[in-house]
Amino acid sequence: MALITVIIVFSAADDISHAAEAKPADIPAIRSLRTGAWSDTATWEGGRIPAAGMKVQVRPGHVVTYDVEAPESLVIRSLHIAGTLTFAPDKSTRLSVGLIKVENSESTDEEGFDCDAHAEEPDAAQPRAVLLVGTAERPIAVNVRALIRLTYIAGMKQESCPAIVCCAGRMDFHGAPLSRTWVKLGTPAAKGDKQVTLSEPVTGWKVGDTIVVTATQFGESKDNVTEERTISSMSGNSVGFDEPLAHDHSGTGEFQGEIANLNRNVVVESADPAGERGHTMYHRHSAGSISYAEFRNLGKKDTLGRYSLHFHLAGSTMRGSSVVGASIHGSHNRWLTIHGTNYLVVRDCVGYRSVGHGFFLEDGTEVYNVLDRNLAVEARPGRKLPKQVLPFDQNEGAGFWWANSLNTFTRNVAAANGHYGFRYEATPTSALKLVLPVMQSDGSEAAIDIRTLPFVRFEDNEVHSSQGLYGFNLGEGVQRIGPDARHPFVVRNTKIWNVHYGFRPQVPSLLVENMTIQSHYGVYHPNFDNHVYRNITIRQTSTEPFNRGHDDDSIQYGVLTVDGLTFDSCRSGGMPLIQISDDNPTGNAVSHFRGVNALNWQDNSRDKAIVNLGGGPRPTPKTEKGVPIYIHGWFGPGRDAMVVSTRSPEFKARPAAFHAEPPLTGNQSQVAEVANVDFPQPLDPIDDLPPATVITDIRKHDGKWHILGTCSDNGAVARVVVNGREARELTPNFATWAIELDAQPQAPQTIVAHAEDAAGNIEKLPHRVVGTMPWP
């Protein structure tokens, strides 16, 4: 009956035409009169339900429940929420609108789009403007759908509309939860299969949902080998499709593809993806979180700041907000942009097909954000955006891109992306020196060269099947500037497979542990300068498994140590497994290897060698010292091999001291036995960085506050303390934690959480919440 009422109240086509052509200031506005249902005439001034082409305002103090599934033709021009608009959680709803602005203001002006007025903190005594499309405690029910269609209306600013914008208000989108938004394949999926097996059971997936099965071979995504299908059946760990697969997808052994569900029952979409697309934006001092919502066909192509999902210059004012389980797909401008924003938690999200980088940290000031267990699929190359903050970014299509590494990246997978899976890029220019204002652990701000900031944590990440050049490009362009040897970049438990260039490490001071690479090139174009590698496997490479310093420049600046290096099934074709660098401009360059193994080595060339100069240009050595390579224990305990180039100063000074020893040496390298050479320790890591804690959820039940949160640290977290009590560790290292506290009858109640790590560092800037409902 509510739908019929809406149609009857607005029936004059002439009004639509007039509203569309009128100037924004002349368009009639209808305001709420009281709290009530959208479909109730008594809720609105004049007793008239909002009609197509109108401006609508929910006034301060009013709570309006959106309870209609309006026809697509009924498009509200703009919706200004100064009070609260909440979508009915138990019935299907649809809202077509040109602009939603969540702001505590009586104005219905469509200007001031960038919310500059909210640079200063708003008065805490004033109520927030609120948009609730479900809440974390009561999401939109699984059997219904809430749909917002962002629809361009003639006369609106094309560069900014249609849009949803939150200006110091609260904006929440919460759909029915899924146990997993994406999982690994449990068995191989072959061409012609109409059913696949998942690596684990899932709940929340249903017949009719759209899924994607990721490409698993190098370069496949150019032919759209990441395949979309519709679920036709589900049984246990098996999912059936409407159509058979057209390609094979790996699903056993060490490397498996992924299957991801794109659908949610809370949807924000562009009404005209081929025309003017919509975008969403949170501004400074806003609040709210997102869980299990779908953002599809959003993002304005080639337009700065108009992204599918955008946290814009929020600083630390949105600490406590999170994006969990979201699906962001078909974007013309990124999936999720974190711009000048700290402490955001992004977990279990799926990004599929974007123009330009996918999960994107925009301007180099972002710190203490957590990106955990997200899947990035087919971020495709775009163009540089006009007036972008960092001019060096070519927007070439990285699954994950950042310029400031002081963030946490864990358990993420980048599959079938454009130029990069993971890309850290910070290149100074004549106009930009990269000394930027960065928040410190105590909350103060300091001017820091962002190239000197290492990861909080980079662990358990994976990249495969890139259609462009790189799996993981760490710091190409930093010009040898990075953290010192006591605060190195640390990369742990990384898988890189079926890409062209596996790992390009160009930062100084780097510790890599437990990395597996299966690609055309292994460790490529490295800047070996205080680099430490432990337990590295390079498999099935055909060219330059372990490249010389800076590739064709053949130059090494510092110490390299490798402890545990296995080459498996490499097809080197006369190329050495380990290349020697020619030049040593600092005089300190040297390489030490221990535990080198070559398994199933496929090379019938007479130039077969473990250590040699290798292919590519042969620059004439220019420095007084070369770069010797020590293979510890090669001749037995305490009997080490010193391998040098036959063009090096060391060889030319004492040629009789060296000899050929295939397959260790090749046509341009020889070896001398040396005794008991020390295996150096070029890094001396210390942990002086305090942990970072975020309260992500607070709910009141049975007289208690039930509190959830996350914590990140570069070392081991010893404890999380909330109001003087220790929280429970839900996942390792307190990545997620929980606690229950007695709810005090007085309001508001203050909740304070901080963490302490095993090195004795205590968080200097606890997360403090005053007033706990609604949250955040």
Description of each model-found segment:
Residues 53-184, 203-229, 233, 238-282, ...:
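Extracellular beta-helix/beta-solenoid repeat scaffolds
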Residues 44, 264, 288-297, 319-332, ...:
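Right-handed parallel beta-helix
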Residues 98-132, 136-161, 178-179, 183-184, ...:
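Acidic/polar low-complexity surface segments
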Residues 2-9:
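Bacterial N-terminal signal peptides
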Residues 197-199, 214, 706-712:
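Short edge beta-strand/loop segments characteristic of extracellular beta-sandwich folds
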Residues 686-690, 698-700, 704-706, 712-775:
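Long, low-complexity serine/threonine/glycine- and acidic-rich segments characteristic of extracellular
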Residues 16-155, 169-176, 180-186, 190, ...:
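Extracellular beta-sheet-rich ligand-binding/adhesion modules
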